[in-house]
Amino acid sequence: MRIAIVNDTAMAVEALKRVLLTVPGHEISWIARDGTEAVARCARDTPDLILMDLFMPVMDGVEATRQIMKQSPCAIIIVTASVSKNAGKVFEAMGYGARDAVNVPILGTQESSDSAQLLLTKIATIAKLIGKSSPTSTPKPQTAKLTSFSTHSTLLPPLVAIGSSTGGPKALAAILSRLPANFGAAIAIVQHVDMQFSAGLVDWLNQQTALTVQLATVGDRFEKGIVLVAGTNDHLSLHSDLTLHYTKEPIDYPYRPSVDVFFKSLAQYWNAKGTAVLLTGMGQDGAQGLSLLRSRGWHTIAQDEKSSVVYGMPKAAVQLNAAVEILPPEAIATSLIQQIMFRKSGVPKSDTRK
């Protein structure tokens, strides 16, 4: 795997080089000292992956990520001194397309050893997603056996389920910021993000919306006006008693938490129609689940190509004819409001594409 390093600190660059070269098959394609240099180098020689610092002279990592994903896109991991202390910047970079984030593994401490192992794990996951890992079969989430549940659908709150990955935080903020405080539906979000950042994502989203955003915990139920966000590296899933749980299965599935696992659990146990949205992201996670939900009568939406940072997941959904509508985030918010209003009034909405 060809990996570039963008960092202005010599010690950090050396630490990253040592960590990367412990894995056969990894090579350093180039090193840049600031964002401007990285944008130029990437345009000439696009690597498989960039390890991007946040704070550098001339151009910082957020702006460099934005320009690279627009001009010569590739996978990007933010590697900086303290991810937790810079959560806002991290999610801003993720909104522009950064795939993940980890503390820089400065040599000599147990914490750095843990960071090094975490970095290699994240790189291995990205390698699977972009087809740069050793050939192995990628397991698919099991298809849910569809059964009906006895709870009458009129007792259940309107539900909006959203799946997102690369570029997701920005798209989520664009949608949630446009929903009113009295939005009459429950919302559940599965964003591909490491559990160490999930609390930070919730805090950041709470600053973007009038709704209440919180981590989904075991035993939670959907509630109007509450936005629940998957909060662990395990897969969020709805159980037959309509409470939320986490499951490790499928263990080797590269997307964690998985949108497909969540969507398929909704198709199995949620005995009411809802609205499901699949946003920007690498790979195909969520496409099968969205298709299944559409077949169960849900209103389904995929983000359009123009507004997607990575047109992978929504593209796969469109190819499966899983999306009733194909829209940018701002229009998705409008559609969600219309869906809730139509359901309250009992007026059906036509099945149209845009």
Curated annotation (Swiss-Prot):
Its main location: cytoplasm. It is found in: Cytoplasm. It catalyses: [protein]-L-glutamate 5-O-methyl ester + H2O = L-glutamyl-[protein] + methanol + H(+); L-glutaminyl-[protein] + H2O = L-glutamyl-[protein] + NH4(+). Phosphorylated by CheA. Phosphorylation of the N-terminal regulatory domain activates the methylesterase activity. InterPro entries: CheB-like, CheB_C, CheY-like_superfamily, Sig_transdc_resp-reg_Me-estase, Sig_transdc_resp-reg_receiver. GO terms for cellular component: cytoplasm. It holds the Pfam family Response_reg. Residues 155-343 form the CheB-type methylesterase domain. The active site is at residues 165, 192, 285. Disulfide bonds: none annotated. It is an enzyme of class 3 (hydrolase). One of its GO terms (molecular function) is phosphorelay response regulator activity. CDD domains: CheB_Rec (cd16432), REC_CheB-like (cd17541). SUPFAM superfamilies: CheY-like (SSF52172), Methylesterase CheB, C-terminal domain (SSF52738). The modification 4-aspartylphosphate is found at residue 53. GO terms for biological process: chemotaxis. PROSITE patterns: CHEB, RESPONSE_REGULATORY. Residues 2-119 form the Response regulatory domain. Its EC number is 3.1.1.61, 3.5.1.44. Belongs to the CheB family. Involved in chemotaxis. Part of a chemotaxis signal transduction system that modulates chemotaxis in response to various stimuli. Catalyzes the demethylation of specific methylglutamate residues introduced into the chemoreceptors (methyl-accepting chemotaxis proteins or MCP) by CheR. Also mediates the irreversible deamidation of specific glutamine residues to glutamic acid. NCBIfam families: PRK00742.1 (NF001965), PRK12555.1 (NF009206). This is Protein-glutamate methylesterase/protein-glutamine glutaminase. The lineage of its organism: Bacteria, Bacillati, Cyanobacteriota, Cyanophyceae, Nostocales.
